Amino acid sequence: ASYRRQRQMCIRDSPNAMGGQGIDMLVPTLLEWGTEEQKQQYIESTLHGETIWCQGYSEPNAGSDLASLQTKGELIDGKWVINGQKIWTSTAQFSQMMFCLVRTEPEASKHAGISFILIPMDTPGIEIRPLVDMTLKAGFNEVFFDDVTVPEENIVGKRGEGWSVANSVLGHERGSLANPNVTLNRLNTLINLMKEETIDGRRLIDVASYRDRLLQVQGKVLAAQAHSLRLLSAKINPGQNVKLGGMIQKLVGTELRHELEGLAIDIMGELGTLYE
């Protein structure tokens, strides 16, 4: 579903969907780790865009060393009581739900003491503070939890398995961050512009040196798309590990985007910075 959505949105040159974190990252994780009740409750509404998710991972003192997070969850009378703070939370102000890493086993090692909990964003005790940048936009937020109470069954996996669940999320995130469909869409946009723009009376697409470089990049983009389909096949076949493939896609996809943007600037100058 995620691949088809991404592909169709790119074909139609649609803007990115706000629900990407839920569709691309959480849904496949719930299919792997979630209970039947969690799958029934969240997957369909997420795929339909009715439930928007944000990710509660980073904290002021837990960024690159995420396992040192201190947001605390205590199980009291069958409910998780959560206190702490998250930061750099994308789209928190628009989300209905958060998938959150919480320290529930304070006596365990830092990786073994973390649990993965689903939190409704309208729960009393949650405060969202937008982080406004120099353009006066707020893509990120701080989120504070003050005795936030959620049902015990909102935990995904078992107590203390949150780090393993989060690694599953990360594997799906790597693949979506370097979506080859987006890169292919940008390549096609560049090709169309090169057919329209001219230099000394010649279309840019007709300049042999430009066309050769374009074909080289096009071959790499199509190869990346084929690799993405291989990852998709692995995801839907039980027992196949997509972690390494996701890492490869993230690395190669990022390098390929840099190469494509550099090509656009080399060929079109300032216009190449705006062609998206």
What are these regions (language model features)?
Residues 62, 87-92, 134-135:
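Glycine-rich phosphate/pyrophosphate-binding beta-alpha loops
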Residues 71-74:
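A structural signal for short hydrophobic beta-strand segments in well-ordered beta-sheet cores
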Residues 79, 83-129:
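A short core secondary-structure module
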Residues 15-37, 63:
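N-terminal glycine-rich flavin-associated loop
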Residues 49-57:
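A short, Trp-centered hydrophobic/proline-enriched beta-strand micro-motif
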Residues 1-11:
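Single conserved hydrophobic/aromatic residue that forms the stacking wall/gate
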Residues 199, 205-208, 222-276:
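C-terminal helix-coil-helix/basic helical segment that borders enzyme active sites and/or dimer interfaces
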Residues 126-226:
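Glycine-rich beta->alpha junctions and the first turn(s) of the following alpha-helix
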